Design a protein with these regions (language model features):
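Conserved N-terminal Rossmann-fold NAD(P)-binding element of oxidoreductases
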Residues: 4-8
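Helix N-cap at the beta1-alpha1 junction of Rossmann-like dinucleotide-binding domains, i.e.
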Residues: 34-37
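Conserved Rossmann-fold cofactor-binding substructure of NAD(P)-dependent oxidoreductases
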Residues: 57-71
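Rossmann-fold NAD(P)-binding glycine/threonine-rich loop
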Residues: 101-124
Length: 147
């Protein structure tokens, strides 16, 4: 079963962890600065396929140590945009697939540079705007007689 590390246990990160867990096809570790939010989610929803953990990306050595002690296949960053280059560097160093939700163009450029030559997928900008906005736009276009 693939193992995924979700960084950030806010609303989006918790939703991502819950949805992945609900498929029954992933073992998920959900991390936040403290154990409070991930543990609360796991306890309230009885998510047996989600392991709560406390990680601080401002301490990349500790995050890298945690990643190195597990067999993760991918990392999903639902952290603030400025944390993503650090997460991308850890993903690259540990040969993980990488996803983030940022819309920040400069950070996306840095992630692209980090990913050059990697043999894993690095997919930034998986957030609300490119996905949901495209769906809404497609629906609205269907209401026009001509474009």
């Amino acid at each position: 079963m693939p193992q995924v590390l979700v960084l950030g246990a806010g609303k989006i990160g918790s939703l991502v962890a819950g949805l992945l867990s609900a498929t029954g096809q992933y073992q998920v570790h959900l991390a936040d600065l403290t154990l409070d939010a991930p543990k609360r989610l796991v306890d309230e929803l009885s998510l047996s396929a989600v392991t709560p953990c406390a990680l601080d990306v401002r301490r990349p050595d500790l995050v890298a140590g945690y990643v190195g002690s597990h067999r993760f296949d991918a990392v999903i960053s639902s952290l603030p945009y400025f944390c993503n280059p650090t997460v991308a560097e850890i993903a690259r160093a540990h040969q993980l697939h990488y996803f983030d939700l940022t819309e920040d163009v400069a950070v996306t450029g840095r992630v692209k540079a980090i990913s050059e030559g990697a043999d894993r997928a690095f997919i930034p900008q998986c957030g609300l705007a490119p996905g949901f906005i495209s769906i809404v736009t497609n629906d609205l276009i269907g209401h026009f007689e001509s474009i």
